UniProtKB/Swiss-Prot annotation:
Part of the ABC transporter complex CcmAB involved in the biogenesis of c-type cytochromes; once thought to export heme, this seems not to be the case, but its exact role is uncertain. Responsible for energy coupling to the transport system. The keyword Translocase applies. Its EC number is 7.6.2.5. GO terms for molecular function: ABC-type heme transporter activity; ATP binding; ATP hydrolysis activity. Gene3D superfamilies: P-loop containing nucleotide triphosphate hydrolases. Its main location: membrane. This is Cytochrome c biogenesis ATP-binding export protein CcmA. Belongs to the ABC transporter superfamily. CcmA exporter (TC 3.A.1.107) family. Residues 11-216 form the ABC transporter domain. It comes from Shewanella sp. (strain MR-7). PROSITE patterns: ABC_TRANSPORTER_2 (PS50893), CCMA (PS51243). The complex is composed of two ATP-binding proteins (CcmA) and two transmembrane proteins (CcmB). GO terms for biological process: cytochrome complex assembly.
Length: 216
């Protein structure tokens, strides 16, 4: 992973325009996201929050504009960016036919990790005792925590998370917020969407980028 101790800006957007089904979601959108930032993309449903996250993650192309990682166009540093990026979409990305432990093992190994204790990691997300349970038999909250468990064993600098608090109880949300603060304090950044109010991350620590629904 990239050593960014001497680098401040991690992810940048320059004049991004996104059009879906002939409707402009946002245009000429520019911003910098720095090491230590926790950034919430906010706005009503249909405003383009998920589309923006996917563009920042390099999973979708904007109609116009550029995205940068460490001041280099992500299309020219794709491998380096992918190594330093953790993207979790609003769908859990958990295979129902695998156990919680097998899902975590798969997700960590596919991300290049080979030295970890799945039971200890699952315990951190309150899944101790559910290691061998099929994901398809878990509750919605347990399903989501299975997906989020990889955050507790991850050294990517850029976390892009679409609705990470979905189906998570208040205690779980607070634990995630603490993890986000720790990650940012260690030189990473967190970019997320959520419809929930955060209790631990206060406004003086949270940056917000607002997208508004456009009718034309």
């Amino acid at each position: 992973m990239t050593n960014i101790t001497s680098v401040n800006t991690l992810v940048s957007a320059s004049k991004l325009t996104c059009i879906r089904e002939e409707r402009i979601l946002f245009d000429e959108l520019s911003f910098d996201i720095n090491a230590g930032d926790i950034v919430q993309i906010e706005g009503p449903n249909g405003a383009g929050k998920t589309s923006l996250l996917r563009i920042l993650a390099g999973l979708s192309r904007p109609y116009a504009g550029q995205t940068f990682y460490l001041n280099e166009d992500i299309n020219r540093c794709r491998d380096e960016y992918n190594e330093d990026l953790l993207y979790l979409g609003h769908l859990a990305g958990v295979k129902s036919e695998l156990t919680a432990e097998e899902n975590l093992n798969f997700n960590l190994r596919i991300s290049g990790y080979d030295d970890f204790d799945t039971a200890a990691i699952l315990a951190k997300v309150n899944l101790a005792g559910f290691e061998e349970a099929l994901a398809g038999h878990l509750s919605a909250g347990q399903h989501r925590r299975t997906a989020l468990a990889r955050l507790w064993h991850n050294d990517c600098k850029v976390w892009i998370l679409d609705e990470p608090f979905t189906a998570i109880d208040k205690k779980g949300v607070e634990e995630l917020e603490q993890l986000f603060i720790q990650h940012a304090d260690n030189g990473g950044c967190v970019i997320l969407t959520t419809h929930q109010d955060m209790g631990i991350i206060k406004d003086d620590r949270l940056r917000k980028i607002r997208l508004d629904y456009r009718f034309v």
